[in-house]
Amino acid sequence: MSFVPTKVFFTKGVGRHKEYLSSFELALRDAKIEKCNLVTVSSIFPPKCERISVEEGLKHLKPGQITFAVMARNSTNENNRLISASVGVALPADETQYGYLSEHHPYGETAEHSGEYAEDLAATMLATTLGIEFDPNKDWDEREGIYKMSGKIVNSFNITESAEGETGLWTTVISCAVLLP
């Protein structure tokens, strides 16, 4: 059986509960993908895959459906502990080529920092496969300019969720790229 996704949507969520597993379930509900049997996969954005809205993507899902996703997930039960989960995306200018999705799930990073890091990871992975010359020691903003000026990388972005832990509760954050037939 060969399955190459033709559509993708991005979603994120936060859940809080006294039980760890229940906090994850609530994060899935917040992201609107709780009815699926999620199978996490690695980080390739398929060629010619169309990005659709969450609302459109949900129309393709049925309860119990085996659903493939790239997921970043993080949890804490520590009060005031900052957590985040981010999926970075880098797309090539040539739609017949594949792009990259990256997962990042740190502690103590803001959503902005976590998102930029995940986006940088995806763009760097794509740049290395496309033969774009760059200095890995330069900061993300400078490398982003180099990547996009090369004409080989057309777009990069991220979807990120962050939250702080609360006393007596588990807090879970997720960010997902949901891949559809």
Swiss-Prot record:
The modification Pyruvic acid (Ser) is found at residue 43. The record marks 42-43 as: Cleavage (non-hydrolytic). GO terms for biological process: arginine catabolic process. The keyword Cytoplasm does not apply. It catalyses: L-arginine + H(+) = agmatine + CO2. Pfam families: PvlArgDC (PF01862). Its cofactor is pyruvate. Binds 1 pyruvoyl group covalently per subunit. Belongs to the PdaD family. NCBIfam families: pyruvoyl-dependent arginine decarboxylase. This is Probable pyruvoyl-dependent arginine decarboxylase.
